[in-house]
């Protein structure tokens, strides 16, 4: 009975992680698009631009990696395309400029986020496997 409760808890935890990850990924993408295409004076600034680009794409990719764990290749393609598309779209605004370096930093941040997400999933899988396996030392 206790084993079943642990498995139910583990499954609900996985579902919650996926849901929160997907929501985080999409909300972060919307925020990045808004900030990237808004006038420069409306852009929030916390750190230097390269750090902000890296961190924003890392958070977005981490969310997507946790939210859609079986779609890693698709997420990687999406991150790379998003980085370059958003930089190119800045060329359409009069007060912004798209730069190749910014796109590369965003892409690297996104790939780092995917890597972090895969690592988190690997750790979670090993922990859940330990929950499912019978105790190695049964009381005699």
Language-model segment annotations:
Residues 2-103, 107, 111-140:
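Bulky hydrophobic segments
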């Amino acid at each position: 009975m206790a084993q079943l409760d642990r498995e139910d808890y583990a499954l609900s935890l996985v579902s919650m992680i996926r849901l929160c990850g997907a929501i985080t990924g999409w909300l972060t993408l919307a925020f990045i698009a808004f900030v990237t295409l808004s006038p420069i004076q409306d852009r929030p600034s916390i750190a230097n631009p390269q750090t902000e680009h890296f961190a924003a794409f890392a958070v977005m990719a981490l969310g997507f990696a946790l939210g859609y764990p079986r779609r890693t290749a698709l997420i990687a393609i999406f991150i790379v395309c998003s980085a370059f598309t958003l930089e190119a779209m800045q060329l359409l605004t009069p007060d912004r400029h798209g730069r190749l370096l910014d796109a590369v930093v965003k892409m690297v941040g996104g790939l780092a986020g995917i890597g972090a997400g895969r690592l988190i999933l690997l750790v979670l899988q090993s922990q859940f496997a330990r929950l499912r396996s019978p105790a190695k030392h049964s009381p005699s």
